[in-house]
Design a protein with these regions (language model features):
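Catalytic core of pol beta-like nucleotidyltransferases
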Residues: 1-34, 42-49, 58-108
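Short, well-ordered beta-strand segments
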Residues: 54-56
Length: 108
C-alpha cells in the first residue's frame, strides 16, 4: 500500500487550518494521486486574500461521479477561496509548459 506524503502548509500560500481542511478533502477524494498547486498561491506572487487556488491532478481521468463528489466537497468546505482543478492528462501541452515552472507538489 502506497504511503501518501503531504507537504506542509508553508509550501503554498494558505493558512494552516485551510491546509488541514484541503488536505483532508484531497486524501478522501484523490487517494493515491499526485496533486500539484500552481499559480499565484504556489508562487507567492500577487496573492490576494481571495485569490483562487489552482490544482493540477496527475493520472488517469477522474470518473465523472468521483469528480462530482470532489467538487461537492470543495463547494461545501469552509475554504474562503475558489479552487480550480485541472487534470494534467487533459490539458494542452502549451498550457502544461506554461504552468510547470510554478508546480508545487502538495500530495504524493
Amino acid at each position: 500500500m502506497a504511503t501518501e506524503t503531504l507537504m506542509p502548509a508553508p509550501a503554498i500560500v494558505i493558512e494552516p487550518h485551510q491546509w488541514q481542511e484541503l488536505s483532508a478533502i484531497l486524501r478522501t477524494h484523490l487517494p493515491g494521486r499526485r496533486v500539484w498547486a500552481f499559480g499565484s498561491r504556489a508562487t507567492g506572487k500577487r496573492v490576494k486574500r481571495f485569490s483562487d487556488l489552482d490544482l493540477a491532478i496527475e493520472g488517469e481521468p477522474i470518473p465523472l461521479k468521483e469528480a462530482a463528489l470532489l467538487d461537492e466537497a470543495l463547494d461545501e468546505s469552509r475554504l474562503p477561496f475558489k479552487i480550480d482543478l485541472v487534470e494534467l492528462s487533459a490539458i494542452a501541452p502549451e498550457f502544461r509548459a506554461r504552468i510547470e515552472p510554478s508546480l508545487v507538489l502538495i500530495q504524493n
